[in-house]
């Protein structure tokens, strides 16, 4: 077996990856396609840690004419000219968690770095005038049009997207900074902006009316991330090495990777796409884990879920028109655009007749990680004991020991503080939904039957559990409702043994008082 290249985990600079001979999944055909399309202004939205910064860096090396870095890559056979252009590269990644004055100083520092390169010693005061001066200076000194690359253009705004007070203030700062991208158009060769969300009222979208948004185009669907074909061809030896470390066959390793990290689609005709950050971390570590979530759960998403009062069971598994999820974040009537653009739900299907998309949670890493982050909303805190309890519950349920799992859950709930608004069955239903989703089983709530709705359905590899939840009553009352409504008949063709579970919660103790389990 050929010696494997090292993995560029956390490295986002194309030149460093190539010069150090690290693994690079070739995306240069997309670079050539975009730069030779006749367009000038482009925008790409993708979730965090999905390869956007590396893509921007690749464009930078390309426009700097560094042909030697592209040896052996697709673009080497496509490009004949390798013209060098002046490049202004800005990253807004460091502009998070800032007030207006802090953000203005941050932009000033980014501009000062470029002004030093181009010998501007007496810069203007306002950020937009300084950017205009930079573009003019680079254009005049080189005699060539200027390339402007802006990575994570929306980073300063994401943490205040839920705030009606702070968002307009910071948005005006960024609008002022980006405004020259229209005024300087004749001096520009290429403008590329990446981010997570689309803020319609920023000047780049409201004024730059000729910008090309490639975020949902079929021909650019695979521009970021690692496709199934790329994994099995360019990383074939890496898959074999991972399988050996995991003690699995190649097909078993591929299936495990698909279950954990695959499932993203960014267009109606998108290839299967893996999360690149998690995939490379798994290859480097030799094991699967929740790498993307461990790198940080955005607080803005949790805040928006609260703002729109979204129940955990309402996330994913829905149909929507493109305008409902590929939409600006300002004035959102639902959290769907943010969930989609942040990578927590993705396209799973498209019906050309109705022009409706099917959206759902992409994979196991996102499903389990998301519900883990939501759990504190239902138990009041996030504890190590909670994680170990859920792991032990999972083992018990795999052995069909639901009674043992319920005992463990009852003991755990007795140790945690309660939250507000716990005087409804809905609260406990959502808590159970979150907990059992973390166990990585199929869970659904309010499942329709001819005679009513089942509170919760849990499907494991070996059994189908029907839960009825009661508040301040008893487990017998819950079991009687299951039998009276004849819920099991609805699932008779499931092919799995059916188990009925009646559970009662007590408002005073905020815990389970009793439960009853019967096989159908």
Predicted regions and their residues:
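Acidic-basic catalytic patches of nuclease active cores, encompassing PD-(D/E)XK
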Residues: 411-444
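Conserved catalytic cores of phosphodiester-cleaving nucleases, focusing on short active-site segments
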Residues: 432, 456-471, 485
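Domain-level recognition of nuclease-like catalytic cores that cleave nucleotide substrates
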Residues: 490, 496-520
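Active-site metal-binding core of divalent-cation-utilizing nuclease and nuclease-like domains
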Residues: 137-142, 433-461
């Amino acid at each position: 077996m050929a010696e494997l290249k090292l993995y560029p985990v956390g490295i986002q600079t194309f030149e460093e990856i190539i010069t150090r001979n690290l693994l690079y999944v070739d995306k240069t055909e997309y670079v050539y396609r975009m730069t030779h399309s006749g367009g000038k202004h482009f925008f790409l939205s993708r979730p965090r840690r999905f390869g956007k910064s590396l893509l921007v860096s690749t464009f930078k090396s390309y426009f700097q004419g560094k042909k030697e870095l592209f040896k052996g890559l697709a673009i080497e056979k496509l490009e004949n000219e390798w013209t060098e252009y002046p490049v202004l590269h800005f990253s807004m990644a460091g502009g998070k968690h800032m007030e207006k004055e802090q953000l203005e100083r941050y932009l000033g520092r980014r501009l000062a770095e470029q002004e030093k390169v181009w010998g501007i010693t007496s810069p203007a005061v306002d950020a937009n005038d300084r950017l205009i001066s930079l573009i003019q200076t680079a254009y005049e000194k080189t005699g060539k049009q200027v390339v402007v690359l802006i990575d994570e253009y929306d980073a300063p705004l994401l943490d205040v997207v839920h705030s009606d007070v702070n968002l307009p203030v910071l948005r005006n700062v960024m609008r002022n900074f980006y405004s020259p991208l229209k005024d300087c158009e004749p001096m520009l060769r290429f403008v590329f902006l990446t981010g997570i969300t689309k803020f319609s009222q920023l000047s780049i979208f409201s004024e730059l009316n000729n910008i090309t948004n490639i975020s949902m185009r079929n021909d650019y669907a695979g521009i970021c991330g690692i496709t199934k074909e790329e994994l099995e061809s360019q990383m074939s030896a890496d898959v074999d090495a991972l399988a050996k470390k995991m003690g699995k066959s190649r097909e078993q390793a591929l299936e495990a990777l698909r279950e954990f990290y695959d499932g993203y689609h960014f267009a109606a005709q998108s290839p299967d796409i893996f999360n690149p950050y998690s995939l490379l971390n798994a290859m480097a570590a030799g094991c699967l884990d929740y790498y993307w979530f461990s790198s940080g759960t955005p607080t803005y998403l949790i805040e928006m879920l609260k703002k729109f009062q979204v129940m955990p069971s309402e996330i994913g598994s829905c149909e929507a028109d493109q305008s409902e999820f590929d939409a600006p974040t300002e004035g959102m009537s639902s959290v769907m655009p943010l969930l989609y653009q942040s990578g927590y739900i993705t396209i799973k299907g498209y019906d050309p007749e109705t022009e409706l998309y099917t959206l759902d949670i992409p994979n196991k890493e996102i499903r389990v990680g998301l519900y883990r982050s939501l759990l504190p909303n239902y138990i009041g805190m996030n504890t190590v004991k909670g994680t170990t309890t859920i792991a032990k519950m999972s083992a018990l349920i795999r052995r069909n020991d639901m009674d043992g799992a319920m005992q463990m859950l009852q003991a755990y709930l007795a140790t945690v503080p309660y939250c507000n608004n716990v005087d409804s069955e809905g609260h406990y239903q959502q808590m159970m939904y979150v907990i059992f989703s973390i166990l990585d089983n199929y869970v659904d709530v309010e499942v329709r039957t001819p005679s009513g709705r089942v509170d919760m359905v849990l499907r494991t590899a070996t059994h189908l559990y029907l839960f009825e939840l009661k508040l301040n009553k008893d487990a017998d009352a819950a079991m009687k409702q299951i039998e009276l409504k004849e819920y099991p008949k609805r699932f008779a063709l499931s092919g799995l043994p059916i188990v009925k579970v009646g559970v009662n919660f007590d408002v005073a103790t905020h815990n389970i008082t009793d439960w009853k389990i019967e096989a159908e």
